């Protein structure tokens, strides 16, 4: 059957259970854990970038929240920096709205802009460290990747090895965010990071909802990619040589 081309993937989800427990207990690949991540997060340049990113666009700047934040920009950055640095930052709640995307209805959790600045600052650094661990064809929510980049990779493989790419397995994971098991996500984060202050913050993001991970929280994009990277991508590539 030649080489299997794994085409991935819209972030929807399927069943955990015994299969993932098997992967969890049989994971043999050791990773060197990284520390001192909080120090990178609280650098002024990163906190300032997070502030600007969350308040981009006229509508956000002209909103009640936006005007208040802009009027106290340096104070907001200073307080959020301190809260992240000492590990005391807590999400202050959210409201929900229903959106339709690709023919599906989804419930989106929306944080205050204030909290989004902190989450953005944390994940801006965390994502940079996580992306080094992903396989080349991980593309969801990653700058300069995505659908077009993945299509280029597929076309290149098809041209270089027509016989080896004769067969492919395309699949989807149903309701990914809704059904993710939070303890699996945190196990993955702990496998990569040893900074306890960071892990406390990440756990607060992951457990914001009673079950699953938030569809509207930026951290969920990285958490989803990481979960699939550990339990699917590297498992298939490292154990079975799937290309």
Question: What is each stretch, according to the model?
Answer:
Residues 83, 156-243:
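Conserved polymerase palm-domain catalytic core
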